Amino acid sequence: MAKGFYISKALGILAIVLGIAAVSTIIALSVVYAQEKNKNAESSPVSSPVSSPVSSPVSPTNPSTTAATTLAQSKPWNHYRLPKTLIPSSYNVTLRPYLTPNSNGLYTFKGSSTVRFTCKESTSMIIIHSKKLNYTNIQGQRVALRGVGGSQAPAIDRTELVEVTEYLVVHLREPLQVNSQYEMDSKFEGELADDLAGFYRSEYTENGVKKVLATTQMQAADARKSFPCFDEPAMKATFNITLIHPSNLVALSNMLPRGPSVPFTEEPNWNVTEFETTPIMSTYLLAYIVSEFKNVQENTPSNVLIRIWARPSAMDQGHGNYALRVTGPILDFFSRHYDTPYPLNKSDQIALPDFNAGAMENWGLVTYRESALLYDPQSSSIGNKERVVTVIAHELAHQWFGNLVTLEWWNDLWLNEGFASYVEYLGADYAEPTWNLKDLIVLNEVYRVMAVDALASSHPLSSPASEVNTPAQISEVFDSISYSKGASVLRMLSSFLTEDLFKKGVASYLHTFAYQNTIYLDLWNHLQWALGNQTAINLPYTVNAIMDRWILQMGFPVVTVDTTTGTLSQKHFLLDPQSNVTRPSKFNYLWIIPISSVKSGTQQAHYWMPDNAKVQNDLFKTTGDEWVLLNLNVTGYYLVNYDQNNWKKIHTQLQTDLSVIPVINRAQVIHDTFDLASAQIVPVTLALNSTLFLNQETEYMPWEAALSSLSYFKLMFDRSEVYGPMKNYLRKQVTPLFNHFEKITQNWTDHPQTLTEQYNEINAVSTACTYGVPKCKDLVSTLFAEWRKNPQNNPIYPNLRSTVYCNAIAQGGEEEWNFVWEQFRNTSLVNEADKLRSALACSTQVWILNRYLSYTLNPEFIRKQDVISTLSSIASNVIGQSLAWDFIQSNWKKLFEDYGTGSFSFSNLIQAVTRRFSTEFELQQLEQFKANNMDTGFGSGTRALEQALEKTKANIKWVKENKEAVLQWFRENSQ
């Protein structure tokens, strides 16, 4: 699933969703320009809440009642993990969604299911997942049971539904026989709710007419909301899906139909579509959709049918064409990368109007937010285009790694999502070879997640399976550690093995475990096998020994270099060095570290730092004017610190001839010094000194690292006297960059060609406007005024729209806000709507922001999938932050009920609204908020709340210790 997804990855609307660590370097400068570049973290993966069921759509006709919700651990149905007594082999599922409400105003679906399973251990009960389903009586019971292949089924004594653990329990009068097969039939009805989970409905307007479709989101634990099933990833089976649907609509599922749809004998206006049997697969990868969508399609040379589906108006305007163009090359790339053909005969990808994740890798039928699949050359920015190709690559990577070979349990989710988050850059780079996408993983994944992983409240990539049980616990695993740290350490592993060797090991892993389940050690073993079958690459330790230190303990090291002696030392890096690390590590927070380096521009031999606190090697010893720089291209997941003299020589090199240091490492110098200063390892003035060369810099990555790093200063000081001198300094530094792009674009009439140039143009304009460059304000006013004169013909180049919209709203009043609101309400282009919706949060008028906050409670105004993002946008505004905080406190119960348990984005809301907290009063407020809402709970935001408390304390301390030095530095350097 995409984050970003998931992550995501990734994928993007708001800078604020990246602001997840108190003294991080990844908070984007403003709500505008990061929209064009970063992955939409709030659209990362989710699963549905586990609260009590909604009102039943039908009255049950069952002989037994729902079980009490108190758990007695001696009873197997009170354990969240399924017993190993029964193993499914196949399902036959028929579903009929009703896309008009019933007499009670509810949308419902009816279904029937037959599951075949084998008894592996003698048992007198069947425990199967079921959630919010009402069963129709079959011979006096909720289900019927029969033997297969000559076995006799025991009689059913009673059945019960256990709400807390989401089980249907069938008590039998006699035990099932070991190695015998059985089939269980059921008929049921459920609500086709708009809750974005399980089998749900999505609504949209086409040509002024309301339309309803039925779709699915099963990951992680919501297939059970659609039909009774053994809903764990290791419980693989085949599935025969049949959909009964209105004859004017199209039915889709993981597989192609067996043949044409046929009329439903009971009602001629309905059709029946029966799909081919799936391969052996996990329940969370199932998908089925009923809609009036249209498609564009093509066949690959290997005869795989590719189809892109979306609303008819979007397809008629060609918005699916870019996705179709890149899907074939990406599938071809991964087939060769994995040395394994694409496992299915078709690849459907569909853009949904309502979808809580960024995308979901359902096998053969990938579902997306519209913004992650559709691209309009007339209104979409380069960031929108990058999002489409990277999210497609992420989801198609899963078709092998995740779908063909699947994790045993959710505690190893990091391997599934981290792998896809790494290779998405490789697949997208193949589809767009001129974009240099592989470099952007450093900014989008490595630096983003370091901000979280440097907290004492972080967690290891891999946890014991026993620590991940409930749906809420599973949901918490879908975080930036799993996605971005997973990607970062796998990239590091691929780098020191070499990509070719890494690919050989992965191919062997996929060939061995096709249609099976694995744990992360299985991958290590196959990489070790690949290593052992060649002699060119030698490691001083096994893959297992190296990598376990990176995945079984949280955090990462800072490597400190003393260039006078050549000594290297390592230490667990914490943004707050006084924070209390309560999680023990059997490796004592020491790592085996791959070290690459250059000395005065010349690359040196590779070096392995053992898991010792201190070592010495002359590679890192300098004399005279020599300087040394570690972690080339930031392939290693660690920070680097140097003695003061070496830092000074690096800064001198940057200010005299910056081209000697690679672009990525110019970004690294800025990023690392700011993180080190945050942790009080180096003076804050050293970090600020690393930005002095920027008046000569025109490359994207160093500027992005600087703006992200300085955005923390903005958060801490935009309510204090420091902000004035800070604005003056940044205005001085960015003016040459603004002038550079003004020149190369012929006064903004042309556009840069490369991806990173376009991103840096966005940086230049956004930063110049934020910090008061007069020509930028004039540019914004002129472009916005031209648009208002003719709203049907927007003259603003898509890359600059977020910046122009936001600044126009900030400079204007009610009239400007209402104009943008009307454009938002009327546009059918999702990427344009996202830009407008974010910009509406830029108002500087309190009453307008409060009105906008109230709109988030009305799904007619703001879609449910966009509520968290909208609240986060408002919170990113220095004026809106306190308003959003008050609103969230007042509406916590409703927000929690709607988003709290299953939404990855919910944690981002807590992070966004608290990221400016830097006073004792705000800390007290946060602690009181926690105390006041213990009964309601915090769901998937629980860990984020603890991190917010930790970050607030760190912010208070940092501001107290650094405010005067920062104020003095900006005053001295802003002239």
Curated annotation (Swiss-Prot):
Residues that coordinate or bind Zn(2+): 394, 398, 417
Keyword ATP-binding: no
Region of interest called Cytosolic Ser/Thr-rich junction, as start-end residue ranges on this chain: 33-74
Post-translational modification as stated in the protein's UniProt record: Sulfated.
Cofactor(s) annotated in UniProt: Zn(2+)
Residue numbers carrying Sulfotyrosine: 182, 425, 430
Database matches in InterPro entries: Aminopeptidase_N-like_N (IPR045357), Aminopeptidase_N-like_N_sf (IPR042097), ERAP1-like_C_dom (IPR024571), M1_APN-typ (IPR034016), Peptidase_M1 (IPR001930), Peptidase_M1_aminopeptidases (IPR050344), Peptidase_M1_dom (IPR014782), Peptidase_M4/M1_CTD_sf (IPR027268)
Top EC class for this record: hydrolase
GO biological process: angiogenesis; cell differentiation; peptide catabolic process; proteolysis
Gene Ontology molecular function, alphabetical: alanyl aminopeptidase activity; metalloaminopeptidase activity; peptide binding; virus receptor activity; zinc ion binding
Domain of life of the organism encoding this protein: Eukaryota
Binding-site list for substrate: 358-362
Family: Belongs to the peptidase M1 family.
Domain writeup: Amino acids 1-191 are essential to mediate susceptibility to infection with CCV (in canine/human chimeric studies).
Protein name: Aminopeptidase N
